[in-house]
């Protein structure tokens, strides 16, 4: 399987796996941006991609940024559809107490390539009953 990548900024760093067997490809900032506490910013990566057929790219936060600085992704995971050809950008938010400077070349997120399936939609009058029923939002308890 191949991920085709086009640099649209000469300073862009191509995504790569940090270690053999890693699920996520590191994504890098191509700009310097200050994110103030409780502020959200759309960070450019300087790349466009062509995903393999029948896949999506899931953009996920980096645990180290979240733990150390409260920096995470606002919509996580973000979905990149197979047909999207625009620049990959990452919607970040600062949940920390201090401003955080995203530097050029900094690892800002990771992208996991996953297979997808589309389903046929069938409208019905009734759904099959289950033991769970309509229980949701805490209905299974915490212990």
UniProtKB/Swiss-Prot annotation:
Positions annotated to bind substrate: 62-64, 75, 79-81, 89
Keywords attached to this entry: Hydrolase, Magnesium, Metal-binding, Nucleotide metabolism
InterPro entries per the UniProt record, alphabetical: dUTPase, dUTPase-like, dUTPase-like_sf, dUTPase_trimeric
Names of required cofactors: Mg(2+)
Name of protein: Deoxyuridine 5'-triphosphate nucleotidohydrolase
Functional description taken from the UniProt entry: This enzyme is involved in nucleotide metabolism: it produces dUMP, the immediate precursor of thymidine nucleotides and it decreases the intracellular concentration of dUTP so that uracil cannot be incorporated into DNA.
Entry-linked Gene3D superfamilies: 2.70.40.10
Similarity annotation: Belongs to the dUTPase family.
Origin: domain of life: Bacteria
EC number: 3.6.1.23
Pathway: Pyrimidine metabolism; dUMP biosynthesis; dUMP from dCTP (dUTP route): step 2/2
GO terms (BP aspect): dUMP biosynthetic process; dUTP catabolic process
